[in-house]
Regions:
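Exposed loop/turn and edge beta-strand positions of beta-sandwich/beta-sheet ligand-binding modules
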Residues: 9, 38, 51, 72, ...
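Conserved tyrosine-mediated DNA breakage-rejoining catalytic core shared by Y-recombinases
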Residues: 19, 24, 28-67
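C-terminal secondary-structure termini that scaffold catalytic or DNA-interacting sites
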Residues: 67, 80-81, 157-177
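Basic, Lys/Arg- and aromatic-enriched nucleic-acid-binding interface segment
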Residues: 1-23, 27, 48, 71-72, ...
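Catalytic-site neighborhood detector that most strongly recognizes the C-terminal catalytic loop/helix
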Residues: 44-50, 133-158
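C-terminal catalytic core of Y-nucleophile DNA break-rejoin enzymes
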Residues: 47-66, 74-95, 107
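The DNA-recognition helices of helix-turn-helix-type DNA-binding domains
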Residues: 33, 114, 123, 136, ...
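C-terminal catalytic core of tyrosine-transesterase DNA break-rejoin enzymes
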Residues: 11-14, 18-25, 112-136, 143
Length: 177
């Protein structure tokens, strides 16, 4: 049973990395929240905001939940995570963190944070990322932009310096015909 919970938590955490879903929404995610056609997509009323989010599923995200079985619309996608009040979904996370040699503790929200950072970095489209996350105000999403700005500084600082012979350029005028 513990191994099954850990595997379910692994799939849920990774799904959050690819969808930005909160833990509360992962726990209440039903098969009825997932549209399979024309493209796999999660259409979910968020627990926190009560707003509906529509999140297209990347192939990697779809593979995490597609078990190729038929499910009732009301059936939970991750039933072990909500089986009882005593289920601690943070234990598997800490176990993985320690096995990976990561000293700094993190929680489930790190997956949502990772999604926000990856999608913003890849697209630069703060409006769409804000909608995917279900933020009620774009200013909430702007917090991630500030983090990306510091990341940009790191990237620029890591660029190699030009050698002296590379610093001068010789421009020639095109010949007149």
């Amino acid at each position: 049973p513990g191994g099954e919970l850990a595997e379910e938590c692994r799939r849920a955490f990774l799904l959050s990395c690819f969808t930005g879903l909160r833990l509360s929404d992962l726990k209440t995610l039903t098969w009825g929240d997932i549209e399979r056609a024309p493209e796999p997509m999660i259409v979910k009323r968020q627990s926190k905001t009560k707003d509906v989010v529509r999140i297209p599923l990347a192939p990697t995200a779809w593979e995490l939940i597609d078990d190729r079985e038929l499910h009732h619309r009301d059936e939970l996608v991750f039933p072990r995570m909500t089986a009882s009040k005593g289920v601690n979904v943070h234990i598997p996370l800490n176990t993985w963190r320690k096995k990976a040699g990561i000293d700094r503790a993190f929680g489930w929200h790190a997956a949502r944070h990772s999604f926000a950072m990856m999608t913003l970095e890849a697209s630069g489209d703060i409006y769409s990322v804000s909608r995917l996350l279900g933020h009620s105000d774009i200013r909430i999403t702007e917090v991630y932009l500030r983090l990306l700005d510091s990341r940009k500084k790191e990237i620029i600082a890591s660029l190699p310096e030009l050698k002296d012979e590379q610093k001068t350029f010789e421009f020639k005028q095109p010949k007149q015909a």
